[in-house]
Amino acid sequence: MKRLGSGARVALAVAVLAAPALSAWAHDGRRDRHDESQVRRGYEIVPKGLKLNLSEKNRALVGLGSYIVNSSGCIDCHSRPSYALGGDPFQRQPEMVNIDQYLSGGRVFGPFKSANITPDHAGKPAGLTRAEFLALMRTGHDPKDPQGDVLQVMPWPTFGKKTDRDLVAIYEYLRAIPALPDNPKPGP
């Protein structure tokens, strides 16, 4: 019996993960080629070694959310350091995302620190309900902050222009990633 090469194994794994997502997308009635390719790519770019919890999640939305989160630089602010030791592409090293602190916050910008956006004990990203998350992304106001305050570093004016479906997909992906405590070593 012929053995599969590593590239073929990766392609097979992506196909196995993406197939249920694409099937769910098709049954949702909102299927188009662009969305399918983003869902598929989303599963391809989940950081190596990161285990997603897909139980009771919409797999198509998780894939789309991964595509948006992992292609939009979210780790640059919400993971510190962004890359694992020896995995910094800016140092011409093969990219390896720091999954030990993946999206657990801790990047300091003057008086501001990026939030831990992994799920809390109840499975809510950053402790926010879906409605609170969408409102934060549209208005920049974190419901945990005093009324009138807006996030000063988070590019919410840009993310707020995304469709509701895109923002729900981000939320669904964040629900699927492992919960982590706040980054124990905040810094620039």
Language-model segments: residues:
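Sequence context surrounding c-type heme c attachment/ligation sites in exported
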Residues: 62-75, 89, 151, 156, ...
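The canonical Cys-X-X-Cys-His
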Residues: 65, 71-81, 133, 170, ...
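Glycine-rich, acidic and aromatic/proline-enriched surface loops and short helix-turn segments
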Residues: 135-143
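Electrostatic cytochrome c docking/interface patches
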Residues: 38-70, 84
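Boundary of Sec targeting at the N-terminus
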Residues: 27-28
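Electron-transfer interface patches adjacent to heme c in soluble/periplasmic c-type cytochromes
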Residues: 92-135, 156-167
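Bacterial N-terminal signal peptides that target proteins for export
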Residues: 1-12
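Bacterial N-terminal signal peptides
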Residues: 11-21
